[in-house]
């Protein structure tokens, strides 16, 4: 929240990757009334009515965000049927404002279609279906201009030292998603690595 912000600069760039499920009648959109759809695999970045549902909502959301001058940079279908992600890029405080407005617009547009938006980290419980997170990309001038392995590792070590404090600020029920499975690290552990999808922090290839 704004009252926690002491100083922040447009030098700080944030790229948010917000995952979510679309729900209708208490189930993920497109799921059968009983049981589950076929296993995940074809849904991720999928096309075609057998692989994705809700694209009209996604497209209307993207257009509305662009019209509102929100820095939306993309969307994609996620690993479960009815699960999607949108990406927002912003600088400084505006990044957070854009994220919240993008969420609000998404909920409103889904409402027009009789669909609800579920941001719970693990809405399907402890099943073999991925949950929904929000990976956050970050950089500052030093990282963009002269980023190095030493710099990245130094920053990761600093974050690791306050891992438990940080987790407390990230919302409730993350323990249900951060189990060490489904491309996550355990909530009580911290790790980082290059292109490591199971780490707390994934560092791009240098």
Predicted feature residues:
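Glycine-rich, acidic/polar active-site loops that bind/position phosphate-bearing ligands
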Residues: 1-206
